[in-house]
Amino acid sequence: KGKRISLGLRGQSDWGVYPRLLLKHVFGITPKNADIRHMTPGALTQQLIDGVTDAVVIPIGAEPNMKEFLIPGLVRRLEATGKKMCYLGVTKEDIDKLNKKFQATWIHVNLKPNTLPHQSKPLGIGVNRAYAVVHPTFSDEKAYKVVMAIAKIAPKMKELHALWRAWSPGLMTCGLSEENTHPGAVKAFKELGWWGQTKKCSPMTYPKG
């Protein structure tokens, strides 16, 4: 409280929406007791570099096994300045409180030291699962073909593009269940022999109402 906090735009889920929910409902931090600013990711990073804000939010990408991490370019910009970065983590109790409030399924994860630049100590973070399946309006045949097409090109894309580095069959199936996945997609996953991996993750759900 009482600090300058720079977040992403109000319409950006990971950069703006979720951090505001965490600040308000877990820490009691609101615009009434702190200087909360919403701006583009590039702008908030520059504010931290210039020393005109006290804290910023920086989402990172990961896969279900938490072995491959996608460090955003904005973190690399901060790293390039040579300035020391101080990470502010969250506890499992913090994330549990947020989940209870919004009927959500955020996950608490402890990052090992040196997962992120200048991270010398373990860091607790809240993980928001990116969840995607074939749209329910697709026919069974189209849903099947979409999954099969991705399964075919993904291994090569993993070698060609940094964003695909975190891809794995586990990434495609984490959070899926018979109830939330298109039947055509389920058929494809079963033929690929990947459906059994859904047991490694709890099914993705959304708040009711």
Label each PLM-derived region with a short phrase.
Residues K1-V52, G61, S168-G184, A188:
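Bilobed "Venus flytrap"/periplasmic-binding protein-like clamshell domains
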Residues P19-L21, F27, V57, K152-A154, ...:
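Alpha-helix boundary/interfacial micro-motifs
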Residues F27-G28, K100-A104, G193, P203-Y206:
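Glycine-centered secondary-structure boundary/capping sites
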Residues I29-F138:
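Pocket-lining segment of extracytoplasmic ligand-binding domains
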